[in-house]
């Protein structure tokens, strides 16, 4: 009888004790709320100045072709233009949006409505239940897709890249909030099953790192090492723009990790090493996949056999080569790619951007700006300042170029 009682009560006691320990641990070690370690995003700057990749004059001519496009208004194109030219750019053309005007488009609902049209749905809405700032995402069936955000958190990532402080006012149709609330919403909604997480990681690295371990709105803990696992898990080509924004997210996260003290770091050494190994393997593949002319195609993950790809369009070659050169400019020092690989790619981009026809350039403005930014990074030059310097260097250059054209509304990165 006693043994029967013991068999019944002992497991119950063990269970109750375990639950008590768990509850004590949960109460004694609550999940920390998300906090922002700084008011301004991290500045992740270049360190190269290689005229062999692109000369000053060549850079001017490339940037001259990549000035902000005129009407019709397209959120994706304006976001890429802001990312390339920055919030302080001003052009000698009243029909061309300046940097401040482009920034206002993303920060002020009235300015957005004036440019996008009074019947256009707002870009942001504030959830009355939790205060989250909701961004209108791209939907293939929407008649307003050209004025939507094309990639999850791409606006936040661009605001971070262009140095927008967290206390910057964000004026919506539902009232005024700030960029901190936009970032807080993005981090609350961040989870490991997101279809696109690259811009979320870039935003996290610039605004939030080294914070780690907060709970998202689904009750899941968000850990930086799990974000790294997502970045390196998928095949190389997976994701927007041939998987190349995943590589951008990796170099930005590594650079953010370099800017904090060892005691502050939350990125595990093994996670950083996994990213380094991944990037090192990609650089090896790029060395094998680069064409004799200097470009890459979407087949680059195949290595040497990618050189056999004869079907790639000029637009795709510029997209891939520009994105590759862009993230390569920010890799950790001991992962720097072979110099001749970078020079050949840079010189090919210079020729390609100058020779591409106007219609192709306008239709692919978004990805082509990555080529311009990449070339600027390899010269450690601010794009707007490089263009201004080029005007005096090439006095007979046109100060206005291109004409307003009706563009397709297919989303392009």
Q: Could you say what each language-model-derived stretch is?
A:
Residues 4-413:
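Preference for long, amphipathic alpha-helical scaffolds in soluble/luminal domains
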């Amino acid at each position: 009888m006693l043994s029967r009682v013991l068999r019944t009560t002992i497991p119950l006691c063990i269970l109750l004790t375990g639950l008590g320990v768990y509850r004590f641990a949960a109460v004694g070690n609550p999940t920390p709320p998300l906090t922002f370690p700084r008011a301004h995003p991290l500045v992740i700057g270049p360190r190269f100045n290689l005229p062999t990749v692109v000369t000053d004059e060549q850079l001017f001519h490339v940037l001259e072709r990549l000035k902000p496009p005129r009407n019709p208004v397209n959120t994706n194109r304006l976001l890429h233009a802001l990312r390339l030219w920055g919030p302080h750019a001003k052009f000698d053309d009243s029909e061309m949006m300046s940097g401040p005007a482009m920034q206002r488009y993303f920060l002020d609902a009235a300015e957005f409505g004036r440019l996008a049209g009074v019947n256009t749905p707002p870009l942001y809405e504030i959830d009355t239940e939790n205060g989250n700032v909701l961004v209108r995402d791209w939907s293939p069936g929407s008649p307003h897709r050209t004025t939507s955000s094309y990639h999850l958190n791409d606006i936040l990532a661009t605001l971070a890249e262009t140095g927008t402080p967290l206390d910057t006012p964000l004026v919506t149709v539902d009232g005024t909030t700030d960029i901190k609330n936009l970032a807080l919403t993005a981090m609350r909604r961040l989870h490991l099953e997101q279809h696109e997480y690259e811009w979320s990681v870039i935003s996290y690295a610039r605004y939030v790192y080294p914070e780690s371990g907060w709970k998202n709105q689904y009750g899941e803990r968000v850990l930086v090492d799990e974000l790294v696992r997502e970045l390196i898990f998928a095949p190389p080509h997976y994701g927007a723009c041939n998987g190349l924004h995943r590589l951008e997210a990796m170099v930005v996260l590594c650079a953010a990790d370099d800017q904090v003290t060892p005691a502050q770091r939350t990125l595990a050494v093994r996670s950083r090493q996994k990213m380094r190994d991944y990037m090192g393997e990609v650089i090896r593949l790029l060395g094998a996949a680069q064409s004799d002319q200097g470009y890459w195609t979407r087949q680059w993950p195949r290595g040497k056999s990618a050189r056999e790809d004869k079907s790639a369009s000029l637009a795709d070659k510029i997209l891939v080569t520009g994105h590759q050169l862009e993230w390569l400019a920010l890799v950790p020092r001991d992962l720097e790619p072979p110099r001749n690989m970078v020079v050949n790619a840079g010189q090919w981009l210079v020729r390609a951007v100058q020779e591409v026809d106007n219609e192709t350039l306008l239709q692919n403005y978004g990805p082509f700006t990555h080529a311009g930014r990449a070339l600027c990074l390899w010269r450690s030059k601010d794009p707007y300042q490089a263009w201004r310097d080029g005007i005096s260097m090439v006095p007979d250059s046109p100060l206005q170029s291109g004409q307003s054209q009706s563009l397709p509304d297919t989303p392009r990165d």
